UniProtKB/Swiss-Prot annotation:
Family the UniProt entry places it in: Belongs to the BI1 family.
MF annotations from Gene Ontology: calcium channel activity
Name listed for the protein in its UniProt record: Uncharacterized protein DR_0893
Regions crossing the membrane: 26-46, 56-76, 84-104, 112-132, 142-162, 163-183, 206-226
Phylogenetic placement of the source organism: Bacteria, Thermotogati, Deinococcota, Deinococci, Deinococcales
GO cellular component, one term: plasma membrane
Gene Ontology BP terms: regulation of proteolysis
Coarse class of the protein's main subcellular location: membrane
Keywords linked to the UniProt accession: Cell membrane, Membrane, Transmembrane, Transmembrane helix
Disulphide connectivity of cysteines: none
Keyword Membrane carried by entry: yes
Domain of life: Bacteria
Claim: Cell membrane is one of the keywords in the record: yes
Localization terms from the record: Cell membrane
Length: 231
């Protein structure tokens, strides 16, 4: 009986260690991606000639970003960890290039404030998603359709040009991606609890980092827009 309880305790501890390792690897990839994006954006903005060239190539760069996200998402199980990592790094760098325009459009104070609030919001919701007992998996379809609805509203506003609609979209966007942060974190935790390991775990941590990275980036962009709307 005692031996059986010890074995159970050892198994539980091993599982907890696997979860910690997996989540730490995921957050490390995400943090590295954000750092790379920030660094590339800053360095690009410091070079006026490069910044102007990037601005002229904005559409091709955005299409390249979409292509990388598509490949990482759709072929996650076929890519090696090395290739997935390289694609993630490439995506973060491309995002940095396109984000360099933000440093011209917004004041340093606005960017720093939005980043700080984004970090706080992301951190709280990620912790909530990790520790909450309620199963959030059923929310997946809701989040999918909510994001699609948000994209449609943003496309409509490109033609309408309503500042009120833009503010409303941004406020909904912050809440939506805050919720997605909790959802994605719980899905990653559950994946780690399933006993995933080796190359498969490495690939999953990179794709998980991409999901969390996108959650953070969207929260940041919507908060920037909210701050700009109130100025």
């Amino acid at each position: 009986m005692v031996k059986s309880m010890q074995q159970i305790a050892m198994t539980q501890q091993k599982t907890l260690d696997q979860v910690r390792t997996f989540m730490a690897r995921t957050y490390s990839w995400m943090a590295a991606g954000l750092a790379l994006t920030a660094g590339v954006a800053y360095l690009t903005a410091q070079n006026e000639g490069l910044a102007m060239q990037v601005a002229s190539l904005r559409l091709p760069l955005m299409l390249a970003q979409l292509a990388l996200v598509f490949v990482l998402s759709m072929f996650a199980q076929r890519l090696s960890a090395a290739v997935a990592g390289a694609l993630f790094v490439g995506y973060a760098a491309l995002t940095g290039l396109t984000f360099s325009a933000l440093l011209f459009a917004y004041s340093p104070a606005a960017v720093i404030t939005a980043f700080a609030v984004s970090a706080g919001t992301f951190g709280l919701m990620s912790v909530a998603g990790f520790v909450i007992k309620k199963d959030l998996s059923a929310m997946g379809r809701f989040f999918l359709f909510a994001v699609l609805g948000l994209v449609v509203a943003m496309l409509v506003n490109l033609f309408v040009g309503s500042s009120a609609l833009s503010l409303g979209i941004s406020m909904i966007g912050v809440f939506l991606f805050a919720g997605l942060t909790a959802y994605d974190t719980q899905m990653l935790r559950n994946l780690a609890l399933s006993g995933i390991s080796g190359e498969q775990a490495e690939r999953a941590s990179i794709n998980g980092a991409l999901a969390l990275y996108l959650d953070f980036i969207n929260i940041f962009l919507f908060l920037l827009n909210i701050g700009n709307s109130r100025d």
